[in-house]
């Protein structure tokens, strides 16, 4: 597991902090879901630090590098957000979160913002307020080359690794309840389980498994796109309107300089190379490409047409059977 910047005293529930290049990095203990009032934008400005929840083990989006520094696509954006709201990239306190704790960290006001590859869903939107999106994803499935999973049907009788609290867990639980899921709290734990054979495949955002497979040559992404095209967005505590509006304004204004394309070039292209087109991932100004929506609509239309054709065939077969019965009588 990647080196942590700080030690968490689990027995006492305390968190240790360390200063690094002006930014504060924190790993906080779970307090069991207590709620607290979020800080307003004015309070954040008065304090001089914005608290942002990020992943520490989801390379290349939020991770700790070999020098002990937090890096990634989400982190790059977090630093820019701090600069534009407070005056400096150093005016940010990064707190490490797990997938299943993202909502709780907002509800308990441990962080002001979550920038941890947070997929927008209706269920989550009931608990937090999402800002405009800055990325789009689908699910992917990575597995060993010598037993490559290329279709969901290949998972029958197999063990699929997922991380708790992710859209992958929800998707397979709701759509493929017969597939055995092996669940972990952290991404690094999930990848370790895949490497040592405790599961046959791992599903999470396709952007991540594609990056991981690039660095682990005996593994490949046999299913590159599964489920809907979803969006990734910042989130704040429910009702923290001033901060939400400020983030939305920031995302809109950054479109003028194509900021998230620069973010891609800086943090993702070194991992993906030319294997991923930034247009398939990047969202500028909070506006999702209309082609994605059109593709989803077309897919739904195809499904509807197929269902209708199936119904017509069944009706024709029933009619033919009735006619044969009448003739026999």
Identify the residue ranges that each predicted region occupies.
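Acidic, polar ligand-binding/catalytic clefts
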Residues: 79, 91-154, 220
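Short helix-initiation/N-cap motifs at beta->coil->alpha
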Residues: 92-104, 147, 182-192, 196, ...
């Amino acid at each position: 597991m990647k080196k942590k910047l700080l030690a968490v005293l689990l027995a006492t529930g305390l968190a240790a902090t360390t200063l690094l290049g002006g930014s504060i990095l924190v790993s906080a203990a779970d307090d069991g879901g207590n709620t607290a009032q979020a800080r307003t934008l004015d309070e954040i400005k008065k304090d001089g630090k914005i608290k942002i929840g990020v992943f520490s083990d989801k390379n290349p989006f939020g991770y700790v590098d070999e020098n002990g520094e937090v890096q990634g696509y989400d982190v790059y954006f977090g630093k820019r957000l701090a600069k534009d709201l407070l005056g400096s990239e150093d005016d940010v306190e990064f707190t490490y979160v797990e997938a299943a704790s993202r909502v709780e960290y907002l509800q308990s006001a441990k962080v002001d913002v979550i920038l941890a590859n947070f997929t927008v869903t209706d269920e989550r939107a009931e608990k937090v307020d999402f800002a405009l999106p800055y990325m789009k994803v689908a699910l992917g499935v990575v597995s060993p080359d010598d037993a490559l999973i290329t279709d969901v049907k290949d998972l029958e009788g197999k063990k699929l690794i997922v991380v708790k609290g992710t859209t992958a867990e929800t998707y397979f639980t709701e759509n493929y309840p017969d597939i055995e899921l092996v669940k972990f709290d952290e991404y690094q734990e999930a990848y370790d389980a895949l490497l040592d054979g405790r599961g046959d495949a791992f599903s999470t955002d396709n952007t991540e498994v594609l990056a991981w497979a690039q660095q682990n040559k005996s593994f490949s992404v046999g299913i590159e796109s599964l489920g809907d095209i979803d969006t990734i967005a910042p989130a704040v505590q429910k009702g923290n309107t001033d901060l939400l509006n400020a983030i939305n304004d920031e995302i809109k204004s950054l479109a003028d300089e194509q900021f998230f394309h620069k973010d891609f070039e800086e943090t993702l292209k070194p991992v993906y190379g030319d294997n991923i087109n930034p247009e398939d991932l990047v969202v500028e100004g909070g506006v999702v490409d209309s082609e994605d929506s059109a593709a989803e609509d077309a897919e739904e239309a195809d499904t509807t047409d197929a269902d209708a054709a199936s119904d017509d065939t069944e009706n024709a077969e029933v009619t033919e059977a009735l006619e044969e019965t009448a003739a026999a009588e």
